[in-house]
Amino acid sequence: MEKYFAPSELIINEDGSCFHLHLKPEQLADRVILVGDPARVNTVANHFDSIECEVSSREFHTITGTYQGKRITCQSHGIGCDNIDIVMTELDSLANIDYQTRTEKKEHRTLTCVRIGTCGGLQPYTPTGTFIASVKSIGFDGLLNYYGGRNDVCDIKLEEAFKQHMHWDPIKGAPYVAIADEQLIEQIAQDDMVRGYTISCGGFYGPQGRKIRIPLADPDQNEKVEAFEYDSLRICNFEMESSALAGLASLLRHRAMTCCMVIANRYAQEMNTAYKNTIDTLIVKVLDRI
């Protein structure tokens, strides 16, 4: 029996678009570039040879076009894993649910999703300007723990090793380790990118060890994170979305990964706010390789 998705669960707008993104099924390409900043969608689309459509709703800005013969959708997601939950669920629904019958399509359509973002470097070999590809992402946000099958797509041994190393306080909720698509990593992350682990935090300040006016629950968090090593790789960076992206993509049978440019190095306490021109280099690399 076909699974029917009720209007209260899968919300479809009157114009036939998905609830938050306001995107219609025919407007979605198989290749998707994800960016946090809605304005960065235009930066990506400036490289397109042609523009097919443009849609904006709240922080979700979409442009679909072509680049060197490849049809690509560039989608902004805003900040945080909670927004990735919205974006990935709705993109998957556009690809794999018939909006007319509200039932799952018989043939699965696989999306290839690459997030281009900014991050904070955590190692001496990740100074500002470094491009980092997230091989595995440790989610501090807890989002994937709400979905069935999370253990099937996560690195449980790495999770346990990390919790033991950190003396993890269970009051924070269990971290999860999501795995990027290995073939996509090989395709995108070439010699000009550092491969490593990433931590996706549930916030920008306290969760990333920034003490402004409120004391930190674990003042030694970042030092412990920087020292962690597993299977010859270290945690290279902090950001706020890659774990949810990799985890949800795995559960939904899509291909996904994140590559970020370091704009702050927490180890060296350096920051580069004038990064917008430099990130264009990373954008072109991803466009060429996706």
Explain the meaning of each model-derived region:
Residues 120, 137, 199-206, 244, ...:
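Glycine-rich beta-alpha junction loops
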Residues 175-180, 237-244:
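Polyanion-binding loop/helix "lid" in catalytic or ligand-binding cores
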Residues 232-236:
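Short pre-catalytic strand/loop immediately N-terminal to key active-site residues, enriched for Gly-Thr
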Residues 265-290:
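His/Asp/Glu-rich mid-to-C-terminal helical/loop segments that flank catalytic regions of hydrolases
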